[in-house]
């Protein structure tokens, strides 16, 4: 084996020596540039993940400025609301359940003296224009500086597109896409008029890599990626920062993951990173996009730098993983049905 390798190396060296010297220099330069690009990408990863911080949120408004948070009653939305309140922002909380919104608003007002809150119960899946009109009236005259587009829905369990219920398919697209766009359409003019503001939209690994058995959800997040990067360019002259946040799993009701780990943070950890890493672009394919949680960023960099996040191998692995998750979910449901 060793002798065969030595022979191959000898043949390669002989071939290289036969190449004209100008071409050797050209190939060597291209190779050096490729290695340099990889090294710079790795340095950027380390700086953005462990050393650099984003701007102070005061960039978007003084104490008492308002922040609009959608999907605010649970999970990441609830944590965004809590951490923005801790930084002196008043809150407009938008979600489906009135009782949860009222409870959260009361909890935060008791915790943070002087905090003002407004709540709006609306079901984004209904795509009711009257709801967006109510939102516009609610925030009219407020000094809104931040919009957190957090509302979203995934599939209840991984499922093939052919077996996806029509109602689930429609709900995912309506909430994730139309809900985000229509909310932004209401809030963005206020941010542009005041010449400063932040629009932060939640993305997903599923939007950066095609994800079989979550096809509709994956497509909705990919749509938001392109929309967000386009919107960022449009609103930059108005002083509005538009940022798209990439995340892997976080312990939320939507992810159905209960335990934190090295790769899976809790909402508090993730939101702290998301608000602290604004503007630190870590996705070289799309500007104004960042992956705030360090292990998510490292994981994504490894995939991007090796097999590629849209390669056939990555899609195959994604399919295999989600078929397994589906099968385990179905077995669990069958066991619970027997108990009843």
UniProtKB/Swiss-Prot annotation:
Origin superkingdom: Eukaryota
A Gene Ontology cellular-component term: endoplasmic reticulum membrane
Entry's Gene Ontology molecular function annotations: ketoreductase activity; very-long-chain 3-oxoacyl-CoA reductase activity
InterPro entries noted in UniProt: 3_ketoreductase_fungal, NAD(P)-bd_dom_sf, Sc_DH/Rdtase_CS, SDR_fam
Keyword Transmembrane: yes
Catalytic activity: a very-long-chain (3R)-3-hydroxyacyl-CoA + NADP(+) = a very-long-chain 3-oxoacyl-CoA + NADPH + H(+)
EC number, as in UniProt: 1.1.1.330
Record's keyword terms, sorted: Endoplasmic reticulum, Fatty acid biosynthesis, Fatty acid metabolism, Lipid biosynthesis, Lipid metabolism, Membrane, NADP, Oxidoreductase, Transmembrane, Transmembrane helix
Active site (UniProt): 217, 221
Job of this protein: Component of the microsomal membrane bound fatty acid elongation system, which produces the 26-carbon very long-chain fatty acids (VLCFA) from palmitate. Catalyzes the reduction of the 3-ketoacyl-CoA intermediate that is formed in each cycle of fatty acid elongation. VLCFAs serve as precursors for ceramide and sphingolipids.
Protein name according to UniProt: Very-long-chain 3-oxoacyl-CoA reductase
Biological source species: Podospora anserina (strain S / ATCC MYA-4624 / DSM 980 / FGSC 10383)
């Amino acid at each position: 084996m060793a002798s065969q390798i030595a022979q191959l190396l000898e043949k390669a060296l002989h071939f290289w020596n036969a190449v004209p010297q100008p071409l050797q220099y050209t190939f060597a330069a291209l190779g050096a540039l490729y290695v340099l690009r990889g090294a710079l990408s790795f340095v950027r990863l380390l700086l953005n993940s462990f050393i650099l911080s984003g701007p102070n949120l005061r960039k978007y408004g003084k104490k008492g400025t308002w922040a609009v948070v959608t999907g605010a009653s649970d999970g990441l939305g609830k944590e965004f609301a809590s951490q923005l309140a801790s930084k002196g922002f008043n809150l407009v909380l938008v979600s489906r359940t009135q009782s949860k919104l009222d409870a959260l608003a009361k909890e935060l007002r008791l915790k943070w003296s002087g905090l003002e809150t407004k709540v709006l119960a609306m079901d984004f899946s209904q795509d009711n224009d009257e709801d967006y009109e109510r939102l516009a009236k609610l925030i009219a005259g407020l000094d809104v500086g931040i919009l957190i587009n957090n509302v979203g829905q995934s599939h209840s369990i991984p499922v093939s597109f052919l077996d996806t219920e029509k109602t689930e398919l429609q709900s995912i697209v309506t909430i994730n896409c139309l809900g985000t766009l229509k909310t932004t359409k209401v809030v963005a003019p206020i941010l542009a008029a005041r010449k400063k503001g932040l629009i932060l939209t939640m993305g997903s690994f599923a939007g950066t890599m095609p994800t079989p058995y979550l096809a509709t959800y994956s497509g909705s997040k990919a749509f938001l990626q392109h929309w967000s990067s386009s919107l960022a360019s449009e609103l930059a002259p108005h002083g509005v920062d538009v940022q798209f946040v990439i995340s892997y799993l976080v312990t939320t009701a939507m992810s159905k993951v209960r335990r934190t780990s090295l790769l899976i943070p809790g909402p508090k950890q993730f939101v702290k990173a998301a608000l602290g890493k604004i503007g630190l672009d870590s996705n070289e394919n799309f500007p104004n996009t960042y992956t705030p949680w360090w292990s998510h960023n490292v994981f994504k960099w490894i995939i991007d730098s090796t097999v590629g996040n849209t390669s056939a191998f990555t899609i195959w692995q994604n399919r295999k993983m989600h078929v397994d998750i589906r099968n385990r979910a179905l077995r669990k449901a069958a066991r619970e049905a027997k108990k009843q």
